[in-house]
């Protein structure tokens, strides 16, 4: 038998085995170094992230120094018979403030059931809502589901008022973090009802209206407390995108959103199945067009000349008697 050949083969196998062990140990060593560096990187990024968040929160305004109540409101002009003939507004002032008890329950729930269904449960930020919005965005590749609570929207509309001018992701990210932080702080010192009241008085509802009372009068020529379920759903539909869901300019878009809001209200048990069906059958948009036609007709009436004269006289008196500048007089007249 050829033992020399077998010994050579065995030695070659042993050599290959040793080489494999060396390579294996080297790979394990490289893997350990890689994992160590990865953990170190994660820890470093984590600390940097915490430092960034701490800096952003530290630079946020104090909850004691902010005001969520808007100062400007619309000015109403009456004739000698105490009949309203015009409403004067400037940018950010076309609102008519009302208390929460003047808002019908179905109007409150029209907003809550769609914009912030856990409003009475969360502490200012809705972690479940954030998770749901993230899941929908990832699965549909369409980040259309909002995660901002009503409290955050109140802060955005009344404290972080320059959010529309944000030109970078970092600016938006910073504002969002401060918004969430202040939302939690605000709910520690402010009741849910007060936050809801402020929200309903400050949201942009299209056609140069702010708040549900101004919107109710603009679209339906009635006070908010007299709105029907169908009409409430129309107004609540606007807030997600005031231009796109404007019931005068884009009634079809608004109708689609309105149907979703009515479904949410029914699912939450805030309207019955019968009320839901009745609301869907309501020819609400024809009424809106009639009101709009009347408003446009009145804006071209002789009253407009009378109103212009009243404005000029009041502004002149404010400047001559009160010592106002032209700008101060203008703001006083048009901002309530």
At which residue positions do the language-model features occur?
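An N-terminal domain-start capping segment
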Residues: 30-34, 55-59, 109, 272, ...
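Hydrophobic faces of stable alpha-helices that mediate helix-helix packing
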Residues: 25, 29, 45-46, 174-177, ...
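Non-catalytic structural connector segments
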Residues: 273-336
């Amino acid at each position: 038998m050829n033992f020399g050949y077998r010994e050579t083969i065995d030695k070659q196998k042993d050599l290959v085995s040793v080489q494999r062990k060396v390579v294996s140990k080297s790979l394990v060593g490289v893997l350990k170094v890689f994992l160590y560096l990865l953990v170190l990187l994660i820890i470093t990024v984590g600390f940097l992230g915490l430092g960034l968040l701490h800096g952003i929160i530290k630079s946020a305004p104090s909850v004691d120094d902010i005001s969520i109540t808007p100062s400007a409101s619309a000015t109403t002009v009456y004739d000698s018979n105490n009949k309203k003939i015009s409403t004067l507004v400037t940018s950010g002032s076309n609102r008519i403030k009302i208390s929460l008890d003047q808002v019908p329950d179905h109007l409150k729930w029209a907003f809550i059931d769609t914009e912030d269904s856990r409003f009475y449960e969360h502490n200012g930020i809705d972690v479940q809502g954030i998770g749901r919005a993230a899941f929908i965005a990832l699965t549909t590749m369409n980040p259309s589901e909002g995660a901002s609570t009503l409290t955050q929207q109140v802060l955005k509309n009344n404290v972080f008022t320059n959010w529309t001018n944000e030109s970078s992701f970092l600016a938006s990210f910073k504002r969002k973090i401060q918004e969430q932080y202040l939302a939690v702080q605000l709910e520690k010192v402010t009741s849910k009802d007060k936050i809801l009241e402020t929200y309903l008085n400050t949201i942009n509802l299209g056609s140069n209206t702010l708040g549900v009372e101004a919107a109710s009068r603009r679209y339906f020529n009635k006070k908010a407390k007299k709105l029907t379920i169908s009409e409430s759903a129309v107004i609540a539909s606007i807030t997600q995108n005031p231009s796109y869901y404007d019931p005068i300019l884009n009634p079809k878009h608004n109708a689609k959103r309105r149907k979703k809001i009515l479904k949410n209200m029914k699912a939450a048990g805030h309207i019955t199945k019968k009320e839901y069906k009745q609301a869907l059958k309501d020819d609400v948009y024809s009424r809106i067009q009639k009101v709009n036609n009347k408003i446009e007709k009145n804006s071209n009436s002789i009253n407009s000349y009378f109103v212009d004269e009243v404005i000029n006289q009041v502004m002149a008196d404010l400047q001559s008697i009160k010592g106002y500048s032209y700008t101060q007089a203008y703001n006083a007249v048009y901002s309530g």
